[in-house]
């Protein structure tokens, strides 16, 4: 997408790869649980946690903390969801002075950052469809309930049989991603032309997202999200796993809080004990969190 629009591919790739660094174990359920644990200690947000990682926690150099990423990268990560609305949260987790007045919090992010954000949505929705089918939460044929997928499914319906079912899933998802990207490119070019976007300043002050779907595909995306909500996210087995993930996170927080010296370094504890606990837990994988929980339950 960035290449087609003659934008900075390296910046777009960096933002896309770095965005999920701040995710907790057990996805959004884990994030909600950790945020509840940190309610009285500043809260938790996975987007801002990504910034904490690249600015403070990942240390590779003698002269400074963090990875010394460009201000364009930091701004893109900070504004993953658009202009910054909760300055108080940013101040608690990062510190507004950290950016030294180099970032205007109320403006829109770069086109590269907008591409990264919407690409995340494209990948998220399509791969959740694929995962839902593979997990037997719904069947491929049920995609006919979504207008967007209906025409794609009909195109391959006669070819699908039990021997090529998995290939059919890949093909339909591939077509879906292709259609979304084509629509995104067409609509973005239309926006740039109509609003006469010529500079970074024009982008920042545009007052809207420029990299976005047409109204038709935006409505389709809402349909897809509703389908996934009813068929997958609200499924009893999924909710049960999410609940277990929350229990594990909260239990680990309690365990580490009761004896932080056993898990954290002296340097970590001298700054902010609870933030250090949050950093530690958010950096765990699902497997590590489960194993640690099993050792102490």
Where are these regions (language model features)?
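Well-ordered mid-protein domain cores that form the structural environment of catalytic cofactors
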Residues: 1-47, 51-53
């Amino acid at each position: 997408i960035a290449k087609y629009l003659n934008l900075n591919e390296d910046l777009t790739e960096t933002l896309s790869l770095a965005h999920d660094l701040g995710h907790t174990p057990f996805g959004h359920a884990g994030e909600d649980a950790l945020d509840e644990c940190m309610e009285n200690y500043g809260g938790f947000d996975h987007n801002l946690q990504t910034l904490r990682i690249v600015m403070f926690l990942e240390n590779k150099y003698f002269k400074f903390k963090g990875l010394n990423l460009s201000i364009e990268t930091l701004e893109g990560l900070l504004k993953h969801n658009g202009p910054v609305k909760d300055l108080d949260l940013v101040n608690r987790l990062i510190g507004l002075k950290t950016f030294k007045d180099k970032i205007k919090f109320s403006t829109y992010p770069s086109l590269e950052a907008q591409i990264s954000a919407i690409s995340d949505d494209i990948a998220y929705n399509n791969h959740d469809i694929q995962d839902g089918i593979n997990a037997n939460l719904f069947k491929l044929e049920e995609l006919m309930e979504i207008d967007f997928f209906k025409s794609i499914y009909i195109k391959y319906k006669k070819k699908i049989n039990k021997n090529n079912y998995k290939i059919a899933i890949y093909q339909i998802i591939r077509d879906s991603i292709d259609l979304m990207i084509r629509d995104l490119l067409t609509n973005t070019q239309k926006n740039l032309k109509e609003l006469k976007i010529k500079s970074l300043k024009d982008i920042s002050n545009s007052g809207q997202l420029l990299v976005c779907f047409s109204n038709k595909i935006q409505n389709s995306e809402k349909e897809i999200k509703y389908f996934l909500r009813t068929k997958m996210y609200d499924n009893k087995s999924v909710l049960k796993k999410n609940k277990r993930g929350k229990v594990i996170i909260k239990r680990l927080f309690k365990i580490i809080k009761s004896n932080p010296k056993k898990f954290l370094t002296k340097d970590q504890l001298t700054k902010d004990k609870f933030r250090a606990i949050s950093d530690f837990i958010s950096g765990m994988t699902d497997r590590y969190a489960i194993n640690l929980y099993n050792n102490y339950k």
